[in-house]
């Protein structure tokens, strides 16, 4: 009967409920994938070394150990530019790749950037630091860089009235979210200080090669203020009774 059919309720199509949790999970997954992609891209995007003075240039390299020794003997100050140090490194160090990547990595080189201290939120100027950079090529023309920050700190030795203690910390004066110090870089990606333990093996042989020079500076007690682009070594302060 048509009247009975009209009186019957029409079937209601069941609606799919809006899933807030499902959409949040989807967006969270997309965000994680985007973050991973960015990390991979940044780690394989090398920092620019074309603007690094003296990098890979052996010509006219200064004899830094000799110049430093003369300054110590004369109780005089001496200053080296990035170009001076990088030419010296290019002429004196011959880095080699070891391990699993040895058959892929070629033409490694070492350079240094000198960063002056930056102004902190409280108005104080942070310590200057040096950035040791290792550059190598993998494959046909794929350039890769890693770097390690070294910040020098000096204080008077409480056990030896005439001595100065020098130590180096593996970070610069920049911080990541949470106040974590930046210890170095992989490509253009800043790496927290705590993760530098994974990069230290790449720098150990390099640091060992220059231990005599490092010890000469430490034993002399010379100050090591670092300004933008320059390493300044100053005679130790005379302590009076």
Residue ranges: model-predicted function:
Residues 7-241:
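Extracellular/lumenal and peripheral-membrane lipid-interaction modules
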